[in-house]
A protein has these predicted regions:
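An alpha-helical support segment within catalytic cores of ATP-dependent transferases
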Residues: 2-15, 85, 122-197, 210, ...
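A cross-family signal for key residues in well-ordered alpha-helices
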Residues: 65, 235, 266
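ATP-binding pocket architecture of kinase catalytic cores
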Residues: 24-150
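A glycine-centered beta->alpha junction motif in the catalytic cores
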Residues: 84-107, 119, 138, 154-158, ...
Length: 294
């Protein structure tokens, strides 16, 4: 990996005599291979893909920057994101966070921090984001919409329907039900929803606890939307403790009828998993559709 050491020397703010002395592969990052780069004084987390042009990592860095600006939950500092100098592929270089076990206080801090993040409103009060980004490696359209119902239909459900069709994972009856749901969202999604800043891909693998017990958010797919959509995803695959939810509820209680919409919002993430991982997620998608449209 001498080429990576040379690339890192070009993009990192190294001191004149500072040399990268170690580059070790580590676990972390679902969209690329991950490494820790070390000098005698410092460490960085490096994630790269030889088959990407760097845009995925640029969008990740922009999402981290938005979360950092909000100041609600810590994020790693970004040192570089983009193409690899003089080589095909892309990479992102982040501050190395020494991880440790999550403490009770860590999960409570994450819950309070997410509540604070969700109080951050979009510029102009609209839903979406000023550019498209990615959820995993799937393109995620954004742009701006005046209502959450419009955004959820036009920028979330319908794009995934089209991607699923291309992958052969949208049989006729599933498509029919999904279109009926899109056409009747006003039955379940009320007016007056405020556009909260969302991490966008908050499963238990996209946050970590530092060795000091501080929660950090990683791998975002940010947009401004209904905070219930974010919280619904945290419940889809589990991994968040009751302390996390109690701290969130104390700081920013969810509406009493949130549970009516929870499966509706989990549907987007089930469609993402259907596209990425196959028909094993098809029955879960179908159960949600039957629940809402029969």
């Amino acid at each position: 990996m001498e080429w990576m050491k040379q690339a890192l020397k070009r993009v990192l703010p190294l001191e004149p005599q500072e040399e990268i002395i170690a580059l070790r592969e580590v676990r972390g990052g679902d969209i690329g291979r991950s490494y820790v780069a070390e000098t005698r004084e410092r460490k960085w987390f490096v994630k790269y893909r030889p088959d990407l042009d760097g845009l995925v990592f640029e969008r990740e860095a922009e999402g981290l920057a938005l979360l950092k600006e909000a100041g609600a939950v810590a994020v790693p500092e970004t040192f570089y994101a983009g193409g690899i100098p003089d080589r095909s592929g892309g990479m992102i270089v982040l501050e190395w966070i020494e991880s440790g076990p999550a403490r009770h206080t860590t999960e409570e801090a994450l819950g309070r921090g997410m509540a604070e993040l969700h109080r951050r409103r979009s510029p102009g009060g609209r839903f979406g984001l000023h550019h498209d980004n990615y959820i995993g490696l799937l393109p995620q359209p954004n742009g701006w919409c005046d209502t959450w119902r419009e955004f959820y239909a036009e920028r979330r459900l319908l794009p995934m329907l089209r991607l699923a069709e291309k992958r052969g994972r949208m049989p006729a009856e599933r498509r029919r039900r999904l279109m009926r749901l899109v056409e009747s969202l006003e039955r379940w999604i009320p007016a007056g929803i405020e556009p909260s800043l969302l991490h966008g891909d908050l499963w238990h693998g996209n946050w970590l606890a530092s060795d000091q017990g501080v929660p950090y958010l990683i791998d975002p797919a940010v947009s401004y939307g209904d905070r219930e959509y974010e919280m619904a995803f945290t419940e889809l695959f589990g991994g968040f403790s009751s302390r996390f939810y109690a701290a969130y509820e104390e700081a920013y209680p969810l509406p009493p009828d949130y549970e009516v919409r929870r499966p509706l919002y989990q549907l987007y993430y089930l469609l993402v998993h259907l596209i990425l991982f196959g028909e094993s997620y098809g029955p879960s998608v179908d159960r949600v559709l039957v629940r809402y449209v029969g």
